[in-house]
Amino acid sequence: MDILTERGQKSLEYERKMLERIRSTMCDKHKTNSQIVETDKNMDAKVDGMVVTNGELSGVFESKCRDLSLMELRRYGSWLVTFDKIMDGKRLSEMLRVPYLGFLYLIKDKVVMYWKITDKHGNFLFDFDVRNTRTQKTINGGSVVRTNAYLPFKEGSELL
């Protein structure tokens, strides 16, 4: 699996930093009884984790790290996410009756952005483009043509 390589482990390190930041912001600063629960990184789970508040599931999420600054992401205008992942999160949102969230760690600025992608019924909360594009296949390189979603920058927020 790609996560077991040197690049995969570095990406996992960044993701753990991001999730710790989310934990401290959501739980400590806002005084909520929320927890971030990760899925097994050695498996290809349909989502990267769940948010649990007061013992109840309150969200599912996709999390990614990108070697970008906030300004670079703003210039791109959107966050590219594999469309299959968006649809998997949407289906889980529908089935579990919780929102689907996206967390993006911008490595260069150490900034966490987030998007509330669906409501608790699995309805998309904003429009986004879907296109077939050639992208990097894995953290370790290669290329592949996939159907990708482009989540608009303006629909995301910086986690403060």
PLM regions and their residue ranges:
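Acidic carboxylate-rich catalytic motifs and surrounding loops in phosphoryl-/glycosyl-chemistry enzymes
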Residues: S34-D40, G102-K110
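Beta-rich catalytic cores
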Residues: A45
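Non-catalytic C-terminal interaction segments of nucleic acid-processing enzymes
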Residues: D2, E6, S24, V52-G55, ...
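Acidic, metal/cofactor-coordinating or nucleic-acid-engaging core segments within structured domains
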Residues: D84-L104, M113-D119
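Structural alpha-beta junctions
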Residues: S24-T32, R91-Y100, N123
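Conserved catalytic cores of phosphodiester-cleaving nucleases, focusing on short active-site segments
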Residues: M18, I22, G49-E72
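Acidic-basic catalytic patches of nuclease active cores, encompassing PD-(D/E)XK
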Residues: M1-K41
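Mg2+/Mn2+-dependent nuclease catalytic core
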Residues: R66-G89
